[in-house]
């Protein structure tokens, strides 16, 4: 099971959360990754935690002011990146370019999608994984595996029909170990979450609870 904690732009301590993630990851067969703000990637990677970017741009070296260069992300210690999160939606052509940029830099890719149809389109771009996240459930604490389990199983089937090598994750409302187990039961091989850890009073305890049943 792959657990990706997106810190978004929350006012949290990314290094402390990364240290907790690295420690908890040693107690479980699950992989726990942390996606901090771009400026924090190096510090987070230095903790030994599996580190992802929140986005990379579909650009190469050159005159691209404001772009997040995949090579820079990799040089600072990230091993993967999110793409097309619901809060940072991109056009399909740009997602394709970002997947290519990430692959060029040796980064794993997780492309987010809102529904099974978008999952199929994302899978056709050849990422390492796609993640289905209904926007209405993001940050609610109500897990997608409980509120709309069919969207997870349908997303798994949609990706399988396009490219069986693409992993399927689910997100939105994931906060407990039970949520993670339910996602796996529906066919997902990973989960995305944010506020359940980034806004927790005790992020280490929240992480431990997430992976305890695994």
Curated annotation (Swiss-Prot):
Q: What is this protein called?
A: Triosephosphate isomerase
Family membership noted in the UniProt record: Belongs to the triosephosphate isomerase family.
Q: What is the lineage of its organism?
A: Archaea, Methanobacteriati, Methanobacteriota, Stenosarchaea group, Halobacteria
**Which superkingdom, per the lineage?**
Archaea
Species annotation = Halobacterium salinarum (strain ATCC 700922 / JCM 11081 / NRC-1)
What's in the keyword line of the UniProt record?
Answer: Cytoplasm, Gluconeogenesis, Glycolysis, Isomerase
What does the annotation say about its assembly with partners? Homotetramer; dimer of dimers.
Q: What does this protein do?
A: Involved in the gluconeogenesis. Catalyzes stereospecifically the conversion of dihydroxyacetone phosphate (DHAP) to D-glyceraldehyde-3-phosphate (G3P).
Family matches, as Gene3D superfamilies? Aldolase class I
What is the E.C. number?
Answer: 5.3.1.1
């Amino acid at each position: 099971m792959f657990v990706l904690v997106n810190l978004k732009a929350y006012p949290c301590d990314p290094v402390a959360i990364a240290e907790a993630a690295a420690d908890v990851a040693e107690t479980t067969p699950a992989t726990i990754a942390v996606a901090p703000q771009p400026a924090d990637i190096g510090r987070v990677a230095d903790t030994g935690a599996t580190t992802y970017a929140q986005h990379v741009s579909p650009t190469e070296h050159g005159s691209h002011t404001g772009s997040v260069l995949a090579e820079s992300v990799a040089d600072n210690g990230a091993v993967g990146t999110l793409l097309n999160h619901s809060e940072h939606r991109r056009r399909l052509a740009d997602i394709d370019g970002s997947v290519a940029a990430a692959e060029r830099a040796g980064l794993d890719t997780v492309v987010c999608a809102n529904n099974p149809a978008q999952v199929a389109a994302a899978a056709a771009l050849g990422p390492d994984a796609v993640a289905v996240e209904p926007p209405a459930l993001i940050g609610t604490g109500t897990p997608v595996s409980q509120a709309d389990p069919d969207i997870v199983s349908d997303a798994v089937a949609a990706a399988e029909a396009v490219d069986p090598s693409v992993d399927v994750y689910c997100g939105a409302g994931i906060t407990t170990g039970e949520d993670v187990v339910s996602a796996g039961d529906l066919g997902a091989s990973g989960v995305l979450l944010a506020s359940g850890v980034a806004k927790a009073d005790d992020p280490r305890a929240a992480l431990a609870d997430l992976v305890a049943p695994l």
